[in-house]
């Protein structure tokens, strides 16, 4: 069981790393990125893929509650799907609470040449959260395919922010 989970995590990490590298390489340094305000604006825009995924998760949860009639989450009538989606939403918020400020701090502290990497990491993080959600719906072990890459993306942003502000 652990071997399967670890294997899925490694596959997800490899795919996310490759996607980050390819995407960053395809993004030109944005005009005006020498300005901290522009860099922060770009980093906020880079968070939109993850915010869109989170909004879809919340919308799905609301629709499931409406369709099932399980309006009171404290009544003990939540289906397995409602429980899974709630865990997905909770974990996404936990990871975003690390990723979002770290990405903004990295963008603010780094120079313009870092911005393609910042933007690409935002896209990869959002995609990884979507893979996590789909994986969890398939099987709890399959969530590792998206969980590992999104957490490593959060740690990468945090490390890059620390490095940018330590220089």
Where are these regions (language model features)?
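Membrane-helix interface/capping segments
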Residues: 32, 56-80
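Juxtamembrane boundary at the C-terminal end of a transmembrane helix
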Residues: 158-167
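Interfacial loop-to-transmembrane junctions
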Residues: 130-155
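Core segments of transmembrane alpha-helices
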Residues: 51, 90-104
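Hydrophobic alpha-helical transmembrane segments and immediately flanking/interface helices
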Residues: 105-133
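Transmembrane alpha-helical segments that form the membrane-embedded catalytic/substrate-channel core
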Residues: 48-64, 126-134
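Long, highly hydrophobic alpha-helical transmembrane signal-anchor segments
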Residues: 1-54
């Amino acid at each position: 069981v652990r071997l399967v989970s670890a294997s899925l995590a490694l596959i997800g990490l490899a795919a996310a790393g490759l996607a980050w590298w390819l995407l960053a390489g395809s993004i030109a340094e944005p005009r005006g990125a020498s300005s901290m305000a522009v860099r922060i604006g770009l980093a906020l825009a880079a968070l939109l893929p993850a915010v869109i995924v989170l909004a879809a998760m919340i919308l799905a949860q609301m629709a499931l509650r409406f369709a099932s009639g399980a309006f009171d989450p404290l009544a003990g009538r939540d289906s397995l799907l409602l429980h899974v989606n709630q865990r997905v939403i909770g974990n996404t918020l936990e990871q975003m609470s690390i990723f979002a400020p770290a990405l903004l701090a990295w963008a603010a502290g780094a120079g313009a040449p870092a911005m393609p990497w910042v933007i690409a990491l935002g896209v990869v993080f959002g995609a990884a959260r979507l893979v996590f959600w789909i994986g969890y719906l398939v099987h709890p072990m399959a969530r590792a395919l998206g969980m590992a890459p999104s957490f490593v993306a959060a740690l990468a942003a945090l490390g890059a922010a620390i490095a940018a502000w330590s220089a």
